[in-house]
Regions:
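Face-selective signature of the C-terminal outer-membrane beta-barrel domain
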Residues: 63, 67-78, 108-278
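Short, flexible, mixed-charge acidic loops at enzyme active sites
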Residues: 86-94, 151, 226
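Short catalytic-loop micro-motif centered on adjacent basic/acidic residues
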Residues: 2-6
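Flexible, solvent-exposed coil segments and beta strand-coil junctions
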Residues: 1, 34-42, 93-103, 168-179, ...
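Short alpha-helical linear motifs
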Residues: 30-32, 54, 96-97, 157-161, ...
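Short acidic, gly/pro-rich beta-turn/loop elements at beta-sheet edges
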Residues: 15-17, 26, 39-41, 82-84, ...
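Short, highly charged low-complexity linear segments
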Residues: 32, 92-97, 135-143
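Transmembrane beta-barrel wall of Gram-negative outer-membrane proteins
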Residues: 8-33, 46-85, 110-132
Length: 278
């Protein structure tokens, strides 16, 4: 039996492996956890970044007898990303027309990604001429992307006179506005698989065969929209109406971008082969 453990400011990892007394059972299990919070904090946008990554892997093999063995391979992975933005400053333009964009944020983004995988395989060799293998596996992935981000931005003209004591500072405002980014996206996919392989080799004849059956199910939903408004021009407001100041017909908020999709996909795949050689 052997084991290891590593720890750091960004996470840690560990594993254990070994066999039982008679050597029939062997195993290898490992786990990891990592956060990149310190790395993301160096980005231009000032925000509270909290990314987390965790996974667990395992491989177990057991020999029932000299002719028959069973093995299992599994993996679990969970990733989570949370961002709460605060503000951002961006300088751009030329020396003759230097600009600064300052944005103050409200809201947050929360993304989750989960993956599960498991495979069970058995190998049976009743004789030196015949070898049989059966494998069944399952795969599941789930993803979520959710965010509501409100940004209030100011566009500044910077002082471009090289001889001025205020060179590079804000000279005046060129415009203000707001924007909203919204998303509720999800993906759910499942894959089930069963396969068989075999070969028979005796004297001058060799036969190989196999087949595979697989089922796939995918559910994909996307719901995103983006609204950009300058001085609330896109928001509903009372219209001018001489003689009837209370007139206010129905008005709509016009989105800058809108995307809504939903896909449900189910498929079956079957395949097989046989080869005879001398």
């Amino acid at each position: 039996t052997a084991a290891s453990l590593q720890l750091s400011m960004l996470g840690g990892s560990g594993h254990i492996e070994g066999t039982n007394k008679n050597g029939r059972l062997s195993y290898l299990i490992g786990a990891r956890h990592k956060t990149s919070k310190y790395l993301f904090n160096a980005m231009d946008t000032k925000a509270d970044y909290t990314p987390k990554f965790s996974d667990l892997q395992a491989f177990i093999n057991y020999e029932l007898n000299t002719d028959w063995q069973i093995s299992f391979l599994g993996n679990i992975s969970k990733n989570e990303y949370t961002m709460i933005p605060e503000n951002r400053d961006t300088d751009f333009g030329t020396i003759n027309e230097a600009l600064k964009l300052r944005i103050y944020f409200e809201g947050q983004e929360v993304d989750k990604y989960e993956t599960y995988f498991g495979a069970l395989s058995t190998t049976y060799q009743p004789s030196t001429e015949l070898n049989l293998q059966f494998t069944t596996s399952a795969f599941q992935t789930f993803e979520q992307e959710n965010f509501d981000i409100l940004g209030e931005y100011w566009l500044y003209q910077l002082e471009n006179n090289l001889g001025s004591d205020e060179f590079g500072d804000v000279a005046f405002d060129r415009g203000v506005g707001k924007y909203i980014n919204h998303a509720r996206n999800s993906l759910n996919a499942r894959v089930l698989n069963f396969s068989h392989k075999g070969n028979y080799n005796k004297e001058a004849i060799k036969v190989d065969w196999g087949f595979r059956m697989q089922k796939e199910e995918i559910e994909d939903k996307i719901s995103e929209w983006n609204l950009i408004d300058s001085a609330f021009f896109n928001f509903p407001h009372p219209v001018d109406s001489i003689g009837n100041p209370t007139s206010n017909p129905n008005q709509q908020i016009v989105m800058s971008e809108l995307l809504k999709t939903q896909i449900n996909l189910s498929s079956y795949r079957n395949s097989g082969y046989m080869q005879v050689s001398k």
